[in-house]
Amino acid sequence: MAVYVSGKELFEEIVKSKERGELTPRSIFLLQKMIKEISKIFTYSREEDKEDCMAFAMFDVLLYWNRFNPEKSTNAFAFFTQTIKNGTYKGWRRLYKEKSSKFISTSQDSGVYNI
């Protein structure tokens, strides 16, 4: 797999961001690059769906970026990879809901119950 974001550079930018209280422009660029690459692991019916999932991922990054604790770990890449995957998957689940049965029948009854 190609290296598209340096873990060391990402860590340094996140530390700078935490000191400032907001994400630096460079950290936003690096995180957007990660989102673009990670979004490729999902399959989408339309390009707009991919863009929506990427937006969900960015929303999660903006919501949770300050939860990264550099005192506990220097691996910001792993933290943000998981955050991005979770956000992308939230969007994907919303767009492509799993089809499930909405009826229950029991072997004792001949009835079918609607949920």
What does each of the following model-derived ranges do?
Residues 1-98:
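Alpha-helical promoter-recognition and RNA polymerase-docking modules of transcription initiation factors
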Residues 92-115:
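Charged, low-cysteine interdomain linkers and short loop/connector segments
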